[in-house]
Amino acid sequence: MKTKGIVTGIVSNLVTVKVDGPVAENEICYIDLQGVKMMAEVIKVNGETASVQVFESTRGLKNGDSVEFEGRMLEVQLGPGLLSSVYDGLQNNLATMTEVFLQRGEYTDPLDHQKKWAFTPIAQPGDKVVAADWLGEVKEGWLPHKIMVPFSFQGEFTVKSIIGAGEYTVDQEVAVLTNEEGEDVKVTMVQKWPVKVAVKGYKEKPRPNRIMETGVRVIDTMNPIAEGGTGFIPGPFGCGKTVLQHAIAKQGDADVIVMAACGERANEVVEIFTEFPELIDPHTGRHLMERTTIICNTSNMPVAAREASVYTAMTICEYYRAMGLKCLLLADSTSRWAQALREMSNRMEELPGADAFPVDLSAIISNFYARAGMVVLNNGQTGAVTFIGTVSPAGGNLKEPVTESTKKAARCFYALEQNRADQKRYPAVGQLDSYSKYLDYPEIKEYLDETVEKGWVDKVLQAKNLIRRGKEASEQINILGDDGVPMSYHVNFWKSELVDFVILQQDAFDTIDALCPLERQRFMLDLVLEICEKDYDFEDFEKCREFFKNLINELRQMNYSAYESEQFWAYNESVKKMIA
């Protein structure tokens, strides 16, 4: 029998409920508001009183309204049809909700239960299976979508029967499994899983051992992110966080992209809706939307559902990872999620931490980032979830609690700088603050030595040192004037400008420059370092400036030319003559 309760207090979307039976933290309940059932989640239990956060507007709610507890946590439906879909934070399918405004208490089914999928069995009767083992597969777009033993199954099962190849709906029975007690359990293509619990179905979780290509030079060359790695992009408003994330989403070497628009402005999400269905994936030649799921919880949607949206997105990624696929999760912006946590913590009158954020903010963010990673599945294949979040610190202050907490959890840090954005040096990632801890991993060094070239990490560090020396020279020139410093200061400054303009800066709206393969990045960095290793002797700083400006112009034109085209080699020849 379900536990029931009545509303005893309301503070915005925090509601206190007196219950008549046992309830658990994170349990889902429905509050009855004049016939409209509003979903809520238990966040604290104290004796007979439960504090619940409501995922809808509580306008019109009053003391005495009835509440019914479901006895389950917030769950997502997992099955064929997740890709190309647009959901809100509670996994309501927004494509089937046609009104301009979403009505309170209106919840839709995330999957199409009428559509038939072409099923091909993988397992055989008599096979021994455990949770997350593959039973069969259906084609979802061009991806092989594995139908698995539900993650909630515990212990070993024997496949009693499995249906033959054919077209079936997601609700039809595809297999019957027998558990260790001899009981038969039916399996369909759909399973449910609570979003706040990490999906376990794998053998081990090793350290990442290869990088994920994004086509963005400032990431792949200077601060690479590993496949199954974590990174975050903090920066003030208008610095290009969203454009950089969109570039990674379009070009990232991943099978599945999940974008969680968590508390961002609606127009940025609309941009994805309009662009992605038309854009072609450079890796497969198919439409980008075919491999993308969007979890859309914009700034004008309920604040409480922001937390649900990031967990829903991560659970969908973990589901596809269990199929042996490479997944990329982009959350924009995790600051909004942290603000939702702060709002709820303050309403519950908990002890505040720094800037009134919850005291356990660091632990919450770390636990979430820990769900990403590369895994070895039970059958020996590998899957990965790579997570990149953006952080919007108030006033661009990178010392605020959300940035500091995320820094502890993420392995890559891409700090966007206001002054670089003001100078239109995009992407505005500042090299002196940004880092990738993966460059210290022996596995990653070995991978880069094999796939790019021997001693690649040393070359990257050499380029970073050029930028550092150029920054120091620039400060001295600004203080003492052009004539007040030795010529070597001018040369160091212009060498750093060369690295900046040719390697760090990239045009996200140019068809050629937007996507830069690793092979091309290797060629360009080698060329730039070859130029910078030479000794130059100029009569005065104006000659130095003119020489490097002409050189930068030729190299920029190379970036806009198709790799290894006649035009590309012509510019290359011109550069060689200039430095001869």
Q: Residues of each region from the PLM?
A:
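Short histidine-centered loop motifs in beta-beta connectors
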Residues: 54, 59, 119-128, 158-167
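P-loop NTPase nucleotide-binding/switch module
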Residues: 97-140, 145-152, 169-229, 244-247, ...
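Short, compositionally biased
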Residues: 43-49, 80-91, 142-166, 184-199
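Short beta-alpha junctions and helix-cap segments that line functional grooves
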Residues: 39-41, 54, 69-73, 146-147, ...
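Short, surface-exposed secondary-structure boundary micro-motifs
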Residues: 20, 34, 72-73, 91, ...
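C-terminal amphipathic alpha-helical interaction region
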Residues: 539-580
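P-loop NTPase catalytic core
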Residues: 221-222, 228-549, 564
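N-terminal accessory targeting/assembly segments
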Residues: 1-103
